Amino acid sequence: KQCESKCIHLKMGKEAVAIGYLERFAADYERESGNISVPEIAEKNGIKIAVVGSGPAGLSFAGDMAKRGYDVTVFEALHEIGGVLKYGIPEFRLPNKIVDVEIDGLRKMGVQFEKDCIVGKTISYDDLHADGFKGVFVASGAGLPNFMNIPGENFVGVMSSNEYLTRVNLMDAANPESDTPVLQGKKVAVIGGGNTAMDSV
């Protein structure tokens, strides 16, 4: 979108080339046709790389390293691969099926995934090296929220957007019949006005 604000067409009194929509169309067309191409991959070099976290940074790094011939394993603490793409962005803004297509593409490139694995608890840094990993890329993301340190923020029913979105997106907590429903009252206050606040609304 940044290039659209500087598009040469604007100087000619025309609308900017809608590059964002064109990219979206191309990606959707490829996905819906089922003909998703796997990029060219360099010859395997036998070097193992561990990636901690399966969010945007971890997945991007994993793809780049796989293309260069590395053996990549992504370790994810949660039970779903995708990090914030799955737990932090609502389905209406980024459908899970789109994220899953990207993850499947990485699998076709040879990337391995380990779910429910907390590096530092389930497996240690030393364990990774003992298992032959020559490098570790930490892409643990922004899993911990920033609180305001005000009275009442630790009351029952008060939660961070991280907790709320994770519970709704991964644990079906918007369903009143779920094990840990989040819908507890008729009046709700959302503190903040950014994208995450709007996602929580």
Which residue stretches match the model-derived regions?
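Iron-sulfur (Fe-S) cluster-binding segments and ferredoxin-like electron-carrier domains
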Residues: 2-28
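Residues forming the flavin
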Residues: 23-201
